[in-house]
């Protein structure tokens, strides 16, 4: 199946895993070792609220290409049966859009752009 035929939910499914892995690698590299602290710190990067915040910041910085933003919109506008535990529908959809972009960049082997996206999010910093 062509990756451009994947729906937003499928791209977000992969993107969730990619972003979670990047966050976990970063936290371990920073020296965090206690599971309770790792879990709490990771939430400030991968929660729906954090991801929506990152998406807004990236958009304000004009980070996305037209093609990338189309993927974000595809993820954001997808209708999912699931919903976030601690976020409203708008926040959840925005986070799904960012996850879709992570998934698409990974699946299309755009490693340099994926790295640039992650580095820009790290510059924005941990969501409080």
Please annotate each region the language model reported:
Residues 1-128:
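Double-stranded RNA-binding/processing signature
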């Amino acid at each position: 199946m062509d990756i451009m035929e994947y729906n937003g939910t499928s791209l977000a499914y992969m993107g969730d895993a990619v972003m979670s892995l990047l966050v976990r690698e970063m936290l371990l590299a920073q020296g965090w070792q206690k599971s309770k602290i790792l879990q709490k710190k990771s939430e400030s990067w991968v929660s729906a609220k954090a991801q929506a915040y990152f998406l807004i910041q990236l958009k304000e910085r004009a980070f996305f290409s037209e093609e990338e933003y189309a993927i974000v919109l595809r993820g954001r506008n997808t209708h999912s049966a699931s919903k976030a535990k601690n976020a409203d529908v708008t926040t959840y959809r925005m986070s799904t859009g960012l996850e879709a972009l992570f998934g698409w960049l990974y699946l299309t082997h755009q490693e340099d752009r994926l790295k640039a996206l992650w580095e820009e999010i790290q510059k924005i910093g941990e969501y409080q």
